[in-house]
Design a protein with these regions (language model features):
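Membrane-interface interhelical loops and short amphipathic "cap" helices
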Residues: 35-51, 99-117, 165-188
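An N-terminal structural lobe/cap that precedes and organizes the functional/catalytic core
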Residues: 19, 147-148, 158, 162, ...
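Small-residue hotspots
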Residues: 24-26, 32, 56, 86-87, ...
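Cytoplasmic membrane-interface regions of multi-pass membrane proteins
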Residues: 66-77, 132-145, 206-214
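Membrane-interfacial loop-to-transmembrane alpha-helix junctions, especially the N-terminal start
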Residues: 14-26, 72-86, 142-155, 217-219
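Short, intrinsically disordered terminal tails adjacent to the first/last structured region
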Residues: 1-13, 211-220
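Hydrophobic cores of alpha-helical transmembrane segments in multi-pass inner/ER membrane proteins
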Residues: 53-69, 119-136, 188-205
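Hydrophobic alpha-helical transmembrane segments and adjacent interfacial helices
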Residues: 26-42, 63-64, 85-103, 132, ...
Length: 220
């Protein structure tokens, strides 16, 4: 009888783990992408949805990279922190600049640089960091369908971000608040990446819950 009570208590209080955090990060990215689509559909140009998208991607990378941190060498840790700082600067500085000095000379220079091919190179560290984080996380346990989806979701988002910048460079006349973001292939791929990761993470959460329930169930 006591064993049954203890088992039911353990099932009633599930523990939150990295997979739950990964699911939350991907859902944040999905919410930011849909918010951005809605803003443009209504004819509103706002940077807040972009910040939510960036935070969702950075959080997903962070969860993948920091899980199993003890197994990473000191050199890898140093390289990761340096790359993470660079990626955070690349992704968040445009938002800060847009909010603090939207009409400044620095903002004008930044916008001009953003329309050059050299700007595409700035996004390569994002793909590199996302790929390394996914590879590290996949190496912590046997690779299954849900783990592969959860890890590759943010890699798809990173690659789609480069494609998005390239698309805007090659379609300069199709920019503005009224542009239908839902019709843009890069934006569709960004949403697909977040959804892929969210589905994989959700499958992992459900699988972990079933395993916990099986272990907690009384054998008699």
């Amino acid at each position: 009888m006591r064993e049954s009570v203890a088992a039911s208590t353990s099932v009633a209080k599930p523990r939150l783990g990295p997979t739950h955090a990964l699911l939350a990060a991907y859902l944040l990215g999905v919410a930011g992408t849909l918010w951005d689509w809605r803003e443009h559909f209504l004819g509103v140009s706002s940077q807040a949805p972009h910040l939510v998208i960036d935070l969702g991607g950075l959080l997903a990378i962070g969860v993948l990279a920091f899980t199993g941190w003890a197994k990473i060498s000191r050199a890898e840790i140093t390289g990761f922190y340096a790359l993470l700082a660079l990626v955070a600067l690349i992704t968040l500085s445009p938002f800060v600049l847009m909010m603090s000095a939207p009409h400044s000379r620095l903002m004008a220079v930044f916008m001009q640089f953003g329309m050059t091919r050299s700007a595409l190179g700035l996004y390569l560290p994002i793909v590199l960091l996302a790929g390394w984080a996914a590879w590290h996380w996949l190496g912590l346990a046997p690779v299954g369908a849900w783990r592969l989806a959860a890890a590759l979701g943010v890699v798809v988002v990173a690659i789609a971000s480069i494609w998005d910048l390239y698309w805007h460079q090659t379609h300069p006349l199709e920019m503005g608040a009224s542009m239908n973001m839902m019709a843009l292939p890069p934006h569709q791929l960004i949403l697909a990446g977040f959804l892929l990761g969210a589905i994989g993470a959700l499958a992992g959460v459900l699988r972990s819950g079933r395993q916990s329930h099986s272990r907690a169930s009384p054998s008699v």
